[in-house]
Amino acid sequence: MKASVRSTVTLLFFAILCSAFMLIAKPFSGEASPQQSPATSAEGAELYNQRCAICHDNPVDRVPPLFLIRRRSAEDVVQTLTDGSMKQQAKGLSADQIRALAIHLTGKQPGPPIEFNSETNRCTGAPPPINLNAPQWNGWGFDLDNSRFQPKPGIKAEDIPRLKVKWAWAHPGAMATGQPTIIGDRLYLTIEAGMVVCLNAQTGCTYWAMKPGAAVRAAVSVGKLPGGSKAKFALYFGDEKSTVHAVDAETGKQLWKTKVEDHFLSRITGAPLLYRNRLYVPVSSFEETAGRDNKYECCTFRGSLVALDAYTGKVIWKSFTVQDEPKPFKKNSAGTQMYGPAGGAIWSAPTLDLKRKLIYVGTGNSYTDIDSPHTDAIVAFDMVTGKIKWANQVTPKDNFLVGCRQPGVGNCPDNGGPDYDFGSSPVLRTLPNGKQILLGGQKSGVMWAFDPDNKGKVLWQAKIGSGGALGGIEWGFAADAENVYVPVADPLGSAARKPGITALKIANGEQLWHVPAPKAQCSWGTTRCINSQSAAATVIPGAVFSGTADGHLRAYSTKDGAILWDYDTAAPIKTVNAGITKGGTLDGGGPTVANGILYTNSGYGRLIGYPGNLLLAFTVDGK
């Protein structure tokens, strides 16, 4: 891409994506209200009008309104732009310009950059040895099937009404994203401000913290290294600059890092999947936010799956979801060259099928009018070679860019699509009779069942939500041996919206029960108070846990959907490391359960609801 074009698009993506990456909660605070008379500079106001106002004064699709950004602290904005996930987009801005913009946006003078002081709550005893046979939740979906089913949670369904907070921990200067990984008495957590921490899973005290150099948001995985390695166990994760990291799981020391995609708008949002000495990495992007700029040569990103040697970080193979390279196909109204095909981002963790030696992913939409057969699809890759063995596209020609409301304007596709990604991981389940079924949840609000023995042929489908850019099935569902439990987001739109949770039989798609999301009750007030049920669900024997955008985490009976327990995670609470803090919206990663403790982040309010910065641990009676 030409340097001049890259400079131009930097301005656009700064405007659109500042929403996604400046939503960083004030360090260890509950409610951060902007000053009534902000110390605004004229330069900051001018920068905002030039680069941000077009999106945040008229938010559509996934662009949040300005008032959410105003809740951030100035330090958060400065650090994100200088040393965090917005560093590339803010390229070319001076330190003084960044400071001026932060003052204008927040009404506060920036203080020191965000740092995490691990000594504040340092564990006094020696850390427990890592035991991969201990009770655990390792990675995104608990198992290689991505079932999100914990068969041995250490919590009985009948005891769930007695769950109470055992400890609470405040994310340092960031809203709570990601999902906790539990290995015995160790808890590993990614922090969007650009940190990874290791805590004691029983108490929340800190063993270590490290900074990989970019924002991180997905779950991590832990694996054993061969004898003679620099460490005994490695912790694996990807960051928002498309770099995969391996660090010593005992100390946090970097072992290796590998950049898996050179496109300057690429990122890793899904958790890499670890199996033996292979790490399978999904790659996604920011590029679909390019629609408003007619000077940007849109679009050239293609989603990919990358296999790495888990011991060394060496690339074994890389396979693109959109297999044809982008080529010039027309010029837009400004005379800017446009390219296609593009898109097919992989937003979530891959799923491994050892029987067939395949890896399954769900893909996102196309970005241009040049369609691809592997967008909005379930795609099966050969786990040895990376070759695509089959794909089933359920929504063709879903050509979508954020902010496109007028077809053909700027880079907007002439025939815009509905943005019906497969944003969550596929789930492979084996029925009691031995038959295997591959499940996929789509933002259209449709739950799909595919036949892995017949190149992904559709076995059944069930429409359980109205769907949309932020609707339908968003982050993930959970499945036990016979049933699948599916949260539906549907945050905004018509009266047909159906936020809630539905149980279906895996064998045939028959609906067992449906529970609408209760009326929203937000501890922060009525602003952005909605009952969208978009976060990933988690199931244990007898109960399924699912959160809503109003901050409520609930347990439902797997038998009939009866609500067994309801806790407001957004309410103020004393933390073990930073005084009183609030949570917020439950979105993104779901709860994890291991060794009798239920863990959840609270405060992923980037696109819906409200931000917060809590990690909560629940046990029976809080003991």
Predicted regions: what is each one?
Residues 36, 150-183, 187-188, 210:
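Asp/Glu-centered strand-loop micro-motifs enriched in Gly/Pro and often flanked by an aromatic residue
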Residues 28-47, 124-126:
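Electrostatic cytochrome c docking/interface patches
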Residues 62-64, 144-150, 174-178, 197, ...:
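Short, solvent-exposed loop/turn elements at domain surfaces
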Residues 120-166, 321-326:
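Blade/loop signatures of beta-propeller domains
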Residues 10-26:
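Bacterial N-terminal signal peptides
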Residues 36, 54, 63-110, 278, ...:
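Extracytoplasmic electron-transfer domains, predominantly the class I c-type cytochrome c fold
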Residues 157-172, 196-216, 222-231, 236-266, ...:
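Extracytoplasmic/lumenal domain signature
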